[in-house]
């Protein structure tokens, strides 16, 4: 169980977690943060989003139900890249890759990512995501 959990501080570490999903086949996200740009600037919207949509990675995202996120959802094809909405927001994200999960804190004073590579916990988180996905609005 060595290195099953890592705490990675800072915006660069958070970006590296998102970039890691590009190496896999599938990724699920619960992105309820509305203030992420305070920590990572426009990187997600202007850099990562293009890489993700241009990759072969199949994605599902549950995002906060905001006008901006509804506009973001319109960019998705609904097959390879799907989106659903929750009315709540929180300043953290959950990222599920093929073989890892990450909880991301967008606390501007101390942003960080907790990366978990213990496959039993990752499998459990994938079950949790299925429940969230099933309950989220289209």
Predicted regions, residues:
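PLD/PLD-like phosphodiesterase catalytic module centered on the HKD motif
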Residues: 1-7, 11, 26, 37-138
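A short, well-structured juxtamembrane/interface segment
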Residues: 9-19
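Glycine-rich phosphate/diphosphate-binding loops that line cofactor/substrate pockets in enzymes
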Residues: 20-27
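Extended, highly charged clamp/arch subdomains and adjacent linkers
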Residues: 30
């Amino acid at each position: 169980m060595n290195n099953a959990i890592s705490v990675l501080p800072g915006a660069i570490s958070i970006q590296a977690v998102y970039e890691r999903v590009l190496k896999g086949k599938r990724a699920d996200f619960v992105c309820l943060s509305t203030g992420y740009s305070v920590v990572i600037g426009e990187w997600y919207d202007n850099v990562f989003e293009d890489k993700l949509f241009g990759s072969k990675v199949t994605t599902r995202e549950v995002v906060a139900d905001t006008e901006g996120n509804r506009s973001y959802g319109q960019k998705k094809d609904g097959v390879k890249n799907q989106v659903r909405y929750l009315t709540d927001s929180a300043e953290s994200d959950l990222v599920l890759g093929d073989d890892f999960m990450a909880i991301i804190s967008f606390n501007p004073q101390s942003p960080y990512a907790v990366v978990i590579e213990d496959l039993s916990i990752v499998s459990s988180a994938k079950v949790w995501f299925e429940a969230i996905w099933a309950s989220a609005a289209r």
